[in-house]
C-alpha cells in the first residue's frame, strides 16, 4: 500500500479527515522552507510542496507572493528535489505530493522527471495544467514508478467526465471546491460544498477525495466530513506576515497547522 493510502487509512481509524498542507519550496529561503516542512509534519498527514512558478494561473495572491520570494532567492527545480530528498530523510517525514505546471516537467522530459521524483521520494504529483484525458499517458508513466498522479475535479466537471476521472485516478482525487484562484474567500457555504462532495463520493466510496481552495481556520471544522482537507494560502500568508514582522515563520506556521489539526481532531 502506498504511503498516501496509508495516511488516509490511519486518519480513518482516528475518525478525522487527513490534513494536507501546501507550502512553496524555497519560501522564504531553501533552508527555512525545509525547516517549515519538518516542523509542520508533526501535525500534517500529507505535505504538498509547490514548485515556484512565475505565472501560476491557479494560485491566488498569497501563493504567488510565496513563489515570487522563492524565485527571487534563486530557487531552481533541482533545489526543490533537494528539499524533498532532505525532508524524506528526516524522522518526521510524511508523504509528499509535488504540485506544479507541465512546462517544468517538459524541460526535463517526462521519464527523466518521474525518475528523479522516484529517486528523491516523491509520493504523488499534481500537474495543474495537464487535465484529463490529456494526462492519461503521463499518469500511466507515474503509476509504473509507484507515484500517484492526482486528478483534479471541480464544480463544473460533468458527471460523465467525473466518472471517468475517478475510475482512472490513483490514490486520491483533489476536489477544487469553488471556481476561483486559491485563497479566495469561501463564496460557497461549507454545506453546499459538502453536498457536492457527497455526490462525487457516491461515485466511488473507496476513493480518497480531498477538498481544497478557501479552507481556513474558520471553515475547516465545518468540512471535517471530507476524507482530507488542503490548506495552503493560510500558511503562505503566515510566512509573509512573519517576514514583515521579522518573526520566525517556522514557529508561526507550525502554530497555525497545530490549530487546524485540533479543529478537525
Swiss-Prot record:
GO CC annotations, alphabetized: cytosol
Keywords of the record: Amino-acid biosynthesis, Aromatic amino acid biosynthesis, Lyase, Tryptophan biosynthesis
Q: Which CDD domains match?
A: Tryptophan_synthase_alpha (cd04724)
Indicate the residues that form the catalytic site: 48, 59
Q: Which InterPro entries match?
A: Aldolase_TIM, RibuloseP-bd_barrel, Trp_synthase_suA
Query: Has UniProt tagged this entry with the keyword Cell inner membrane?
Result: no
Gene3D superfamilies referenced in this protein's UniProt entry, alphabetically: Aldolase class I
Which EC number(s) are documented for this chain?
4.2.1.20
Instruction: Give the pathway.
Output: Amino-acid biosynthesis; L-tryptophan biosynthesis; L-tryptophan from chorismate: step 5/5
Which transformation does this protein catalyse, written as a reaction? (1S,2R)-1-C-(indol-3-yl)glycerol 3-phosphate + L-serine = D-glyceraldehyde 3-phosphate + L-tryptophan + H2O
GO molecular function term, any single one: tryptophan synthase activity
Q: How does it assemble?
A: Tetramer of two alpha and two beta chains.
Assigned protein family = Belongs to the TrpA family.
The role this protein plays is: The alpha subunit is responsible for the aldol cleavage of indoleglycerol phosphate to indole and glyceraldehyde 3-phosphate.
User: What is the protein name given in its UniProt record?
Assistant: Tryptophan synthase alpha chain
The species is Pelagibacter ubique (strain HTCC1062)
Q: What is the lineage of its organism?
A: Bacteria, Pseudomonadati, Pseudomonadota, Alphaproteobacteria, Candidatus Pelagibacterales
